[in-house]
Amino acid sequence: MKFELDKQDGRARRGRLIFKRGVVETPAFMPVGTYGSVKGMMPEEVADTGAQIILGNTFHLSIRPGTDIIEQHGDLHDFMNWKGPILTDSGGFQVFSLGKMRKITEEGVHFRNPVNGSKIFMGPEESMDVQRKLGSDIVMIFDECTPYPATHDVAADSMRLSLRWAERSKQAHGDNPSALFGIVQGGMYEDLRQESIKGLTDIGFDGYAIGGLSVGEPKEEMMGTLDFTEPHMPKDKPRYMMGVGKPEDIVEAVRRGIDMFDCVIPTRNARNGFLFTHSGVVKIRNAVNKTSLEPLDAKCDCYTCQNYTRAYLHHLDKCGEIQGARLNTIHNLHYYQLLMKGLREAIASETLDTFVSEFYQARGEDVPAL
């Protein structure tokens, strides 16, 4: 992977990630394909929304269907018929989410298979091995996601364990040609975030992610943590904010110098009739949409908005039709990619302030201070 940085507007950055499988323009949003599928979408449809890279889930894919069957197809790209690059997370967050079903030690994590209850162990070496077999273009180190809230001592112990796992991940990654990203941890504590960044940069990675955010903290605390973390991150490497997020959170993070994002929000919310538009959120199952002949978003050129009314989408949702979830997902993913394209163009032309002002004005909101 090669990272090129073309332009800056304030702290915001315009660049690209170059892979053998294609170029990813940044800032970029990655749709989530947990089980090797972006829910409800064909790979070609995902690409048609403008997505250039997607995310796969190491934890879930290692359990179902397992790496053996995926390797028989070639790799994850072949298995799911996705032609572009794929980033795989390490499985750390999913293991963290298991709660009492897992036990963390220095070596790694012992946990129960959530499907059949069998005992499984995953550490840095196991995670790197799975991601190598998946053929990931970007591999994430194995880390512990610090719980929220956490005391300084708990956050420090967790972050330092993640640093030791980062070193082991780098060693286990070995000569794998895929890019390897480190993950900054440290809870909501400035000194711990800085210690994490120094430890990771001393090891050396191809990119750096910010983990442990969007885990239940207030938005102000999330952005405050980003404000004191981002300035210490390497300028010549891509920055990835994991699990974020809502359109306004992406806009604010781009203003603060972040290059990459992923989140299940656009696809999950689509299946629940919660749709994103230039003027804000539309809850398609609300009665006001029952007789509306308007498109979902007049400024959107996606297949859904060009061909269907709000009344039709409301009808499909009320009837529980699969087609409704598909059309909603096509729109939400397209909206996110339009947002990213707009951000990229604004940074390139040094008009980001205007873009941000118009983004919030259309939603009837004030621009948050940086």
UniProtKB/Swiss-Prot annotation:
Q: Which GO terms describe its molecular function?
A: metal ion binding; tRNA-guanosine(34) queuine transglycosylase activity
Could you tell me the EC number(s) of this protein?
2.4.2.29
- Which UniProt keywords are listed? Glycosyltransferase, Metal-binding, Queuosine biosynthesis, Transferase, tRNA processing, Zinc
Positions of region (RNA binding): 243-249, 267-271
**How does the cofactor attach, per the note?**
Binds 1 zinc ion per subunit.
Record field: catalytic activity:
7-aminomethyl-7-carbaguanine + guanosine(34) in tRNA = 7-aminomethyl-7-carbaguanosine(34) in tRNA + guanine
Active-site positions on this chain: 89, 262
Binding residues annotated for substrate, in chain numbering: 89-93, 143, 185, 212
InterPro entries per record = ArchSynthase1/Queuine_TRR, TGT, TGT-like_sf, tRNA_ribo_trans-like
| Pathway(s) where this gene product acts | tRNA modification; tRNA-queuosine biosynthesis
Q: What class of enzyme is it?
A: transferase
Q: Does the keyword Transmembrane helix apply?
A: no
Binding residues for Zn(2+), per the UniProt record? 300, 302, 305, 331
Alphabetized Gene3D superfamilies for the sequence: Queuine tRNA-ribosyltransferase-like
Q: Name one GO cellular component term.
A: cytosol
Cofactor(s) this protein cannot do without: Zn(2+)
Q: Which GO BP terms, alphabetically?
A: queuosine biosynthetic process; tRNA wobble guanine modification; tRNA-guanine transglycosylation
Q: What does the annotation say about its assembly with partners? A: Homodimer. Within each dimer, one monomer is responsible for RNA recognition and catalysis, while the other monomer binds to the replacement base PreQ1.
Question: Could you say which protein family the record assigns here?
Answer: Belongs to the queuine tRNA-ribosyltransferase family.
As for what it does, the entry says: Catalyzes the base-exchange of a guanine (G) residue with the queuine precursor 7-aminomethyl-7-deazaguanine (PreQ1) at position 34 (anticodon wobble position) in tRNAs with GU(N) anticodons (tRNA-Asp, -Asn, -His and -Tyr). Catalysis occurs through a double-displacement mechanism. The nucleophile active site attacks the C1' of nucleotide 34 to detach the guanine base from the RNA, forming a covalent enzyme-RNA intermediate. The proton acceptor active site deprotonates the incoming PreQ1, allowing a nucleophilic attack on the C1' of the ribose to form the product.
Q: Which HAMAP family match?
A: Q_tRNA_Tgt
Note the PANTHER family from the entry: QUEUINE TRNA-RIBOSYLTRANSFERASE (PTHR46499:SF1)
Q: Provide the protein name.
A: Queuine tRNA-ribosyltransferase
Species source reads Hydrogenovibrio crunogenus (strain DSM 25203 / XCL-2) (Thiomicrospira crunogena)
